[in-house]
Amino acid sequence: GDHRDLHSCPTRRSSDLGRTVTALSLGCGTGAAEIRWAETGRFSRIDAYDLSAPRIARATQVAEQQGLDHILHYAVGDIDRLQIADNTYDVALVEQSLHHFSPLDRVLTAISRSLKPGGLFILHEFVGPSRFQWTDRQLAVVNSLLRILPEKFKTKWASAEIKKEVFRPSRWRMHYNDPSEAMESSHILSQLAIHFDIVELKEYGGTVLHLLLYEIAHHFLPGDPEAEKWLALFFEVEDILLQTGELPSDHIVAVCTTK
């Protein structure tokens, strides 16, 4: 399915419960996803948290403007310090934020305990190498494609610099740029299996495309036949490598239920 399916998953799955539901959302940012969920009429209450006060302020403002503040309740909160009541929510939602949380064991325990019996945990996540320590095979594939790509497609966004090679970042650099980035991402799937029953898992790649197109994706817009030809090649290469098991998927959508 396309990217819209990723966002419809929480609504589709919550509707399976046959009633309006209460939801917990962690790492909500400016609340764009939560707005979409609230608009469906499937949720009676969504409690959403993020570390950033400016983002929460923006999310709250938009909810009020859209007349959804009776459903959406935003607050600044750190997952390590949140006092989430047990057996409270029908659904827990995490979109591209779980890979910023650590220790995973404690976080997933808290999420599991917050759910009612039979509750759903729905996540859309990066599950690739922790601290972006890309594998040798992954880098070899990406850089092989980059080498054959014409230079006109390799100028970086808002820059004259040419993207020549993708490297594995140093752990020091990763910690310096963002101490929370991908701390335990490679352990997410194994930890999920410990704390939840995984009832649906969709892998959608990104193992090649994410690294390859980072900073140069603006060249590959609809309407340019040559760019579309290259993009089709990139998708084909990644799809084949995923299908054959040569590379794992770095991104997933999963629906889990409490054990």
Segments from the language model and where they lie:
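Short, small-residue-biased leader/transition segments that mark boundaries at the very start
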Residues: 2-3, 7-14
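A short acidic, Gly/Pro-enriched loop at the edge of an enzyme's catalytic core
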Residues: 83-92
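Substrate-binding/catalytic lobe of Class I Rossmann-like enzymes that use SAM or dcSAM, i.e.
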Residues: 154-219
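Class I SAM-dependent methyltransferase SAM/SAH-binding core
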Residues: 25-26, 30-81
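C-terminal lobe and adjacent flexible extensions of AdoMet/dcAdoMet transferase-like proteins
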Residues: 195, 199-259
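A short glycine-rich, Lys/Arg-flanked "PGG" loop and its adjoining helix->strand segment in the class I
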Residues: 105-120
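A short beta-strand submotif of the Rossmann-like class I SAM-dependent methyltransferase core
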Residues: 94-95, 123
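Conserved class I S-adenosyl-L-methionine
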Residues: 122-158
